[in-house]
Amino acid sequence: MMQGALVLSLAAFIAKILSAVYRVPFQNMVGNTGFYVYQQVYPIYGIGMTFALSGFPVFVSALIAQYRSDYELLPLLKRLFWILSGLGLGVFLILYTQSELIASWMGDALLSSVIQSVSWMFLMMPFLVIARGYFQGTNRMVPTAVSQVMEQVVRVSVILLAASFYGSLTNDLYEVGTWAMSSAVVAAVMATFVLLYYKKSDSFENWNGSRVIEPHKIQWGVLLKRLVIEGGTLCLLSSILVLFQLIDSFTLFKGLVEQGMSQEVAKDLKGIFDRGQPLVQLGMVVGVGFSSSYLPLLSRSYTKQHLEEFEQLKYSLLKMTMVFSVVATVGLLVILPRVNHMLFGDIQGNDVLSIYIISIILASMMMAYHGILQSTGKYSITLIALLIGLIAKGIGNLWFIPQFQTLGASIATILGLFVMLGMIWILSGGKSSSNHQKSTMIKLGIVSIGMAIVVGGLNILFERYFPAGDSRTKDTLLALLLVSVGIIVFIIGAIRIKLFTIREWLMIPKGKSLLRFTRKWKKRGEKDEIR
């Protein structure tokens, strides 16, 4: 089971990287306005993705684990399939037939065809949910993991192919956006084929338990209620950041236009604002990776009531997440203009993005807390915090966008995440910092400030001869150089002030090699002193 959980975590990690990276070439191909078109509708895809991958399949797998030893599950799964089919068909019909209304709520009627394009993926949802839940419920995680990675690879390929047609086959960015969103259903079909391939060697006949459940005893109402409450909660908790983006889709562009801004300028500014999402995703990669790798360890220690080990793992996860999210944020802030130019071709929106990327820290810590609560089955805390955080984000957008435009949306995002993180901390019985935690924060502050001084100092020096925004090639080379310097400074500083324990170093990729290297380095230094 542990190995299976790690396989799923690795697949999720790979999918996160793919999901963050493809947006850069896509934006380069279609520009700010094309990126705006795609990002306006992306949250709908993101919600559908959580339905088919990390929300309902987890619910189905839990249902299988609960009933497998007592009943034949085929009738149960059939009813679940029909309920999910009704849900998927309902969402599809709403999105497809009401696409013009939804587009008008977003403030851009031309988005209608893009919304219709993404709606088709919901018809594939029942197949993916039942198949993934089936395999996960029988502790076979490889089919789900492979289907997830293949789904992302196919989707990214179709999106970039669609973007490549801009300027040759069409000059209509909304048409490109429609093609790009069709990647969702193409990828879902591919994922279904992958799952069917694994299903070939299996049979539902093996699912018979000690007795056969009678169809009338599988109550439709009970299944529907559990699917909505338990499955719906899992879906909401798996789409935290996507829901924040959905609020921006309905309020930011529309809010800018209502303030008297032309639609073309508003689209351009929204496209620049949306650059923050891949930056935040990349900044969160390490933190999310730790959350994924710690989750099975936390679940195992809590289930076996090894509470001391659980507390150690909990503290270690929060510490590692805080360290890497803070370092990533500080590093990005120091060299943001060069990174902006390197990735997106210009240095527009640095002020907006500099606020937005602070969410790397808040979102990473929030996901870490969510992982801890998930391992103990305390979903209600995160759900309450999420709802309050979304309300804060929505009110923040309505309040700040008229005053500060896209900068206001960035501020509202930070506000919403901060409120949510604070609510999670309070509701989970937040305690005052121990001396050990204070020591960690002091050490983290020293390392972060030291890194910022070294990297920032070099950047100021380079700015005299190679101003940011002057040459994309130079900014790319300098950004990569400064990132490398920052990593080296962080590693040396972390080792010198003993920021991590040996066990924590071993949890870091290549951490064991780093420890060996530093030990050899210390021994050589001692020999030189003796001489």
Residue ranges, per PLM feature:
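Membrane-interface helix-loop junctions in multi-pass transport and translocation proteins
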Residues: 142, 153-194, 198, 380, ...
